């Protein structure tokens, strides 16, 4: 897909988020649940509901590699808790989505509310700005499900 087409698709998503109260509420929920985990932070106790259920699975997690797009693959597991790994830019929310880039993070942001969860004052202060000045930062950003 050409950059111009990618920009138009993202702008359409942006308009929908601005006008749709349901999408705005989804963004608020995801941002409120979003967790920034710096390199040296102890993660035990961050999500107690997960820690107390850590032995509930009889089988180890499965990692599946396919030719499907990230959200397309995740949609194949309705009713399941699915994690989508965002190969994210450490310095720009959504990578180059606003300029029409077409890497994995840009594709995720183009067709969901993810960009609007990442592009917040809190994420700029705690994640993007520090990463611009760090040599080799290691942080994790968890964003709860967004449509």
What positions do the PLM features span?
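Conserved N-terminal structural segment that caps and organizes enzyme catalytic cores in eukaryotes
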Residues: 1-141
């Amino acid at each position: 897909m050409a950059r111009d087409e990618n920009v138009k698709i993202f702008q359409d998503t942006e308009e929908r988020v601005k006008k749709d109260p349901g999408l705005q509420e989804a963004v608020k929920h995801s941002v409120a649940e979003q967790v920034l985990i710096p390199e040296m932070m102890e993660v035990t106790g961050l999500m107690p509901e997960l820690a107390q259920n850590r032995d509930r699975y009889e089988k180890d997690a499965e990692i599946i590699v396919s030719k499907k797009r990230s959200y397309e693959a995740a949609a194949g597991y309705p009713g399941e808790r699915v994690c989508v790994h965002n190969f994210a830019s450490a310095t720009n929310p959504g990578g180059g989505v606003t300029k029409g880039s077409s890497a994995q993070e840009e594709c995720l942001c183009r067709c969901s509310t993810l960009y609007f969860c990442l592009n917040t004052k809190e994420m700029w202060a705690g994640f993007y700005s520090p990463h611009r000045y760090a040599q080799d930062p290691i942080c994790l950003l968890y964003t709860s499900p967004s449509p």
